[in-house]
Every structure is written in structure tokens, then in C-alpha cells.
């Protein structure tokens, strides 16, 4: 065997090859506007699969016609091309308020985000609050392109109309 050839049965180790402090990455749309921003105080990169793990990440998705959506969690894993962000532990999704709509906050244990597609989903329990209203369910699909979310099962909630409380 040549010295430069790796043995065929060699198992690649998943060790960090680089670390970054105060990491910030931005992706731009075709018009040069920021589509999303991903920041974290600490990131480890892994050469074996070109993935990264982040501590306390925050992902902010922007649309010109809608308020920003901020997603945070205690941990995240980003795939090699950044197409998928897996967040886990204390995940919070917040849609900023507008003059017409109050802020909306969702909490869940984990969330899989596809930032380029503008979508996310979880199979876990979810709780969403907006002012005094709340809704709970298991499993959720989010489409930031249409500003919609769909809870998949076991849905319960309490809705207070803004008109009724004014």
C-alpha cells in the first residue's frame, strides 16, 4: 500500500478541525438583500462531513414584505452547504410585531430549518403564544414565504380577538 493511501476500513473520526468565536454569516438574495443571518458565540467545524456545530445560535430570516422571524436554541448543527440547520434544546421562534399584528412566539424542544427554502418543521410538542392567546400541538410545519404555520396533531388553544379586547 502506498503511504498516501488510507486503509479502506479506516473509520473517519468526527473531530473539530476549526473553532470560531463570535461567528456571523449572511446569505443574500438575488437582489443583494440579506435573506438570513446566522450568528453564534461559538462554532466548531468538522472536516469529515463539512458540518458545523454552534452554541446558542440565532437565525434571523428577512423578507421585504414581512417582519423578521428570529429562531434561537441552545445548540445547532449546520450541514455542509448550510441548507439545513438542526436546532435543539429550548428552541424559540419569534415573529416580530407589526402595526397590524402583535408579536408571535413559538417554543419547542427542536426544529429543522431549511433557511434557503424559507421553511422549517418539527415532530415535537409546540406551544405558540400571541398576546393572551395560545395554541399547543404536536408537530408543526412553518412556511416563512407565506407567513403560515400548521400544527399537525393534538391541537388545543384559546384565542382572544384583539377587537373584543379593545
Which role fits each region the language model picked out?
Residues 1-166:
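Mature-chain termini and adjacent capping regions
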Amino acid at each position: 500500500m502506498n503511504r498516501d493511501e488510507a486503509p479502506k476500513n479506516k473509520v473517519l473520526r468526527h473531530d473539530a478541525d476549526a473553532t470560531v468565536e463570535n461567528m456571523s454569516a449572511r446569505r443574500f438574495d438575488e437582489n443583494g438583500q440579506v435573506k438570513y443571518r446566522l450568528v453564534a458565540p461559538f462554532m466548531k467545524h468538522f472536516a469529515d462531513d463539512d458540518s458545523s456545530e454552534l452554541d446558542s445560535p440565532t437565525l434571523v430570516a428577512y423578507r421585504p414584505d414581512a417582519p423578521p422571524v428570529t429562531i434561537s436554541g441552545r445548540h445547532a448543527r449546520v450541514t455542509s452547504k448550510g441548507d439545513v440547520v438542526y436546532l435543539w434544546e429550548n428552541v424559540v421562534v419569534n415573529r416580530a410585531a407589526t402595526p397590524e399584528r402583535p408579536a408571535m412566539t413559538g417554543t419547542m424542544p427542536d426544529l429543522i430549518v431549511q433557511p434557503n427554502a424559507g421553511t422549517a418543521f418539527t415532530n415535537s410538542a409546540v406551544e405558540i403564544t400571541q398576546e393572551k392567546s395560545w395554541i399547543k400541538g404536536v408537530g408543526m410545519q412553518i412556511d416563512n414565504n407565506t407567513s403560515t404555520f400548521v400544527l399537525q396533531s393534538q391541537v388545543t388553544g384559546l384565542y382572544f380577538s384583539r377587537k373584543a379586547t379593545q
